[in-house]
């Protein structure tokens, strides 16, 4: 979450993409550089139980990926930019929501409760995929943001909840097959683990974002969903 003079920005890369916070007025697709999305965070409070933890998404930073051979092998397996040699080789699609000031505190409190079980706040830069409607309606808020010198996209420095590799709920690295077997059978207070994954994949499919090589695709997520379907 990041404040400006008019409200706050909320970044999502997992369930927030298809289950947004209340009171948002605008939803903008965004590209997160330098991180890979993986279902390596266990869930005992939403998509699993303490006895049978599920799996939910977290972001793995470039620095951790290149330091651990198993992480790098997994990321290279599903990356269009393999072998990974630079933070910009890692591209993850997310969304940012704009929350007006009168609802900012309510949304902060809601997210602090929702994003528990090992998640902590971190700052990341995202490149916004704005359109003419966004620019017209959020003119003042967007004009405060710098543009990237290569892409020309507006760059937002914002806070996001991440399950780091040293938190007690982190279970990676796992193969897609290992993770899929857990997701296929896990349920929690928020519903089935499969629903979480399927809705995220569907939401991303409806957000076509293009780069030099064509449409950005999360091949890891696609492989994970296909494998889960084999075990259901």
UniProtKB/Swiss-Prot annotation:
It catalyses: glutathione = L-cysteinylglycine + 5-oxo-L-proline. Keywords: Cytoplasm, Lyase, Nucleus. It is an enzyme of class 4 (lyase). GO terms for biological process: glutathione catabolic process. GO terms for cellular component: cytoplasm; nucleus. Its EC number is 4.3.2.7. The active site is at residue 115. One of its GO terms (molecular function) is glutathione specific gamma-glutamylcyclotransferase activity. Substrate binds at residues 10-15. It is found in: Cytoplasm; Nucleus. Its main location: cytoplasm. Present with 1300 molecules/cell in log phase SD medium. Catalyzes the cleavage of glutathione into 5-oxo-L-proline and a Cys-Gly dipeptide. Acts specifically on glutathione, but not on other gamma-glutamyl peptides. Allows utilization of gluthathione through subsequent cleavage of the Cys-Gly dipeptide by Cys-Gly metallodipeptidase DUG1. Belongs to the gamma-glutamylcyclotransferase family. ChaC subfamily. This is Glutathione-specific gamma-glutamylcyclotransferase. It comes from Saccharomyces cerevisiae (strain ATCC 204508 / S288c) (Baker's yeast).
């Amino acid at each position: 979450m990041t404040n400006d003079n008019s409200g706050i920005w909320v970044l999502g890369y997992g369930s927030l993409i298809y289950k947004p916070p209340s009171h948002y007025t605008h939803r903008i697709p965004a590209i997160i550089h330098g991180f890979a999305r993986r279902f390596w965070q266990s869930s005992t409070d939403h998509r699993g139980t303490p006895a049978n933890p599920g799996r939910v998404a977290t972001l793995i930073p470039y620095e951790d990926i290149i330091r651990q051979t198993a992480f790098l092998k997994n990321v290279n397996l599903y990356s269009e930019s393999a072998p990974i040699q630079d933070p910009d080789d890692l591209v993850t699609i997310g969304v940012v929501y704009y929350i007006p000031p009168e609802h900012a505190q309510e949304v902060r409190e809601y997210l602090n409760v929702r994003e528990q079980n090992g998640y902590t706040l971190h700052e990341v830069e995202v490149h916004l995929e704005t359109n003419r409607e966004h620019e017209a309606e959020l003119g003042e808020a967007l004009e405060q943001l710098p543009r990237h010198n290569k892409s020309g996209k507006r760059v937002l420095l914002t806070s996001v909840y991440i399950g780091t590799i040293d938190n007690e709920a982190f279970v990676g690295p796992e193969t897609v097959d290992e993770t899929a077997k857990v997701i296929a059978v896990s349920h929690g207070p928020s519903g089935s683990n499969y629903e979480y994954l399927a809705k995220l994949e569907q939401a991303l499919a409806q957000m076509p974002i293009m780069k030099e090589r064509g449409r950005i695709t999360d091949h890891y997520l696609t492989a994970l969903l296909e494998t889960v379907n084999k075990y259901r």
